[in-house]
Amino acid sequence: KQVYVLIDEYDVPLAKAQSYVYHKDMVTLMSSFLGFLKDSQKDPETNKPVVKKVILTGCLKVAKNSIFTGVNNLKVNTVTNKIDNYTGMIGFTKEETLKLLKDYEMEDFSEVVRNNYDGYKFYDKEMFCPWDVLNFVEDNFNFKQQGLLSEIEAENYWANSTSSPAVYEYLGFLTDSDNQKMQDLVDGNSISFVLNESMNYDCLSEHDPNDFWSLLLHTGYLTLDWEKTKKDELSKDNSSNKEVYVRIPNLEIRKCFKNDIQKRFSSVFIKHNLHNKLVDALSCGNQKETYDIFFDMLQKYVSI
């Protein structure tokens, strides 16, 4: 029989290789490993390809990635696509989540689950994170049965299930405008940027702020704001720049965003701003301001 090949998170090795500076070697290795995509062998008895279909999932789009050079007939679906055959497949729908909670007599906590684990929007579907919902039910079902309702908590499960070292490639390369965008997101607002749908890990060395925000969208820290993003922007082909609006999907991700992204990047922004002020003070010969800045830096960054 012909086989279906399922490959989840195909680009994780590429992301780790980028962080440890052996990306080219990993591209060579994976190109060889995925060689069957380019030339599938045929069954000598049926004369049909051994592999019927391959399904890959990953953070970044597969079409332009260098490991897929020579691969044809790729059908790509991203977080901005409107193909409704796929929009409800990536997680639990609202109806599926409510049914699960009812099955375990935990429907009274549907609002808690919605606030913490809902919020992703894929065109026409509102999606819950399955990992979060299942863990919430498993961890709290016994408390519900025993009447210990005060013990029921919405834990942060996403923080322990994801790692995006590629995001930190942008430390020191973002602007004050990007810092403000982070604050806007944490405050519950949407921000806009030019989406790079064809980015791959080769692009990280360019440190384009738009790629930074694109990466956060692709890795789940953000979700598309379909109401604010103009339809004609999403209708553009992949060679065109698309201005999109994004937001943080829920309370769980907001906590992760503040701890993983904003906190780490904000410290760099502070150092960068002090550096600029120090250069200006020295250039102008302003002794008092130079002294004040040095004193501030010593207090912040030196243990005496």
PLM feature segments, named:
Residues H23-T28, K53-V54, C59, T69:
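Aromatic- and carboxylate-enriched substrate-binding clefts and catalytic-loop regions
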Residues L74-K75, V79, F128-L134, N140-I304:
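Extended alpha-helical interface modules used as scaffolds for assembling large macromolecular complexes
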Residues Y4-D8, S32, K52-C59:
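Structural recognition of the conserved hydrophobic beta-strand(s) that form the central parallel beta-sheet
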Residues V12-A15, D39, V62:
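Residues immediately C-terminal
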Residues Y22-M30, T93, P209-F212:
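Phosphate/oxyanion-binding active-site loops and adjacent basic polyanion-contact surfaces
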Residues Q2-H23:
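Conserved P-loop NTPase "ATPase switch" module shared by AAA+ and STAND
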Residues K64-V71, N77-E138:
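Amphipathic alpha-helical segments of the small helical/lid subdomains adjacent to P-loop NTPase cores
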Residues D25-K52:
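Substrate-engagement module of ASCE P-loop NTPases
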